Amino acid sequence: NPEENEKSIMEFIQANRDIRGIAVMNSRGYIIADILRKKGINDIIIISFDLTSNNTRCIKNGSITALLCQRPELQGFNAIKEMIQHLIYKQEGKGNHYTMPIDIVMQENLPYYK
């Protein structure tokens, strides 16, 4: 419920006036960013995940400072590649541990991302 979200967020901000940053651990950072922007609060840094259209809009208007992007296309590609290697070529996979790059997207480097 958007009204309840706004009420809860503003109660939290008012109870924690010294807060300087918020880390949103999912792709919905735009919800908090939009509320703070609507209320004229622009001195809180917001970091969130994923380059969604709403988060991209907030990066562009400065209400989100940074996004951590996990390259879902590459994750999917690597999963399919491992499955093909195992099912068709009978090769052992790398196990259950894979390292993946994480991009930090900000206003300055946003144009380099789709």
Identify the residue ranges that each predicted region occupies.
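Conserved active-site and cofactor/substrate-binding residues in soluble primary-metabolism enzymes
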Residues: 27, 54, 74-78
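Short, well-ordered coil/turn elements that cap or connect secondary structure elements
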Residues: 41, 61-62, 99
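Hinge/cleft segment of the Venus flytrap/periplasmic-binding protein
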Residues: 71-114
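Flexible loop/hinge segments that line or gate small-molecule binding clefts
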Residues: 52-60
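Hydrophobic alpha-helical
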Residues: 1-53
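Short beta-strand elements at the ligand-binding edges of bilobed clamshell
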Residues: 61-73
